[in-house]
């Protein structure tokens, strides 16, 4: 039986080429913990850097949705980390046991994952391996607490910088990672979108036997592969979030700063405002969330972000149109009840004051119906003016998005 200071290893949980994980117990209190023992001789320079990043980050944070580091010990041959023990297993085992979950549970889980990820990204860390297996559950019943764990692939990533190493788990890897392109923290957000989709469906959105097959399935999809039955039961805001997290264009992928679950929760089928959120357990920082009628109000005060916002919301509408075409769900229902059409209205009202917007508007080759939509949501014409969404084509929206992207 392995011993370390105040902890005794009881039973082996797992073993890899570089480490062994034990279930441990504190000798005095009897409190259970997890002991990870690393063989330093088997760690290359890159793995040592990742381990150092993990230790540096975990030793500096104390947040209920991030696994807690209790103790570290090192000699010439081994390094041992003692982490808190979560008796609820992993989110993966939870999904295997219970299958898909209801939206209110998924949103509650997403709020906790988002809270932990906000701290991670605020510390300029990219996790790179977010998946249900690396999210631990503590507690039982209605008091489940989710904790992001396993930072073995995490790296420091300062603003404006990118990574290029391909790593992670294929079902949850962003397409830019799978394509050997450079990536930033938005890759973590794609992983969160895949987890949200799996919570709602019981399986990941894109699967395959290897990275190539997963990427091929992503690129060949004209819409997110929602189950038609489940899609009919989903709140439009939930469809909105899935579409914006799982955008194949990283520039259009929802960022943690706009992650809606940090500012609103679902009660029955109504989004309810949650005006404050304490990002750290001991209240070292507080995130204020402005709301309009209980809904998240996006910050439109910074002109520099205007093209980016337009791009994100137009790409959502594009994804929605494609989804409607495949599933047969009326496009007008998805768009008119979705959050993005309301945000797009705010954005266009602000954009119409900009010279570049008018130049772009004149350059677009729009059909009459689409022009009516643009003028309506932009506040140029009366909302009583009739129009239909059916004539908005994907190609037109792609062209619009490309124009806006050039201003980002």
From Swiss-Prot:
Protein family membership: Belongs to the protein kinase superfamily. Ser/Thr protein kinase family.
Localization (cell): Cytoplasmic vesicle, Autophagosome
Name of this chain's protein: Serine/threonine-protein kinase ATG1t
EC number: 2.7.11.-
Domain Protein kinase: 7-272
GO MF annotations, alphabetized: ATP binding; nucleic acid binding; protein serine/threonine kinase activity
Record bears the keyword Protein transport: yes
Gene Ontology biological-process annotations: autophagy; protein transport; regulation of autophagy
Major subcellular site: cytoplasm
Binding positions for ATP per the UniProt entry: 13-21, 36
GO cellular component, one term: autophagosome
UniProt entry keywords in alphabetical sequence: ATP-binding, Autophagy, Cytoplasmic vesicle, Kinase, Nucleotide-binding, Protein transport, Serine/threonine-protein kinase, Transferase, Transport
Role noted for this protein: Serine/threonine protein kinase involved in autophagy. The ATG1-ATG13 protein kinase complex regulates downstream events required for autophagosome enclosure and/or vacuolar delivery.
Stored SUPFAM superfamilies: Protein kinase-like (PK-like), Ribonuclease H-like
Active-site feature positions: 129 (proton acceptor)
Top-rank lineage group of the source organism: Eukaryota
Record organism: Arabidopsis thaliana (Mouse-ear cress)
InterPro entries on file: Atg1-like, Kinase-like_dom_sf, Prot_kinase_dom, RNaseH-like_sf, RNaseH_sf, Ser/Thr_kinase_AS
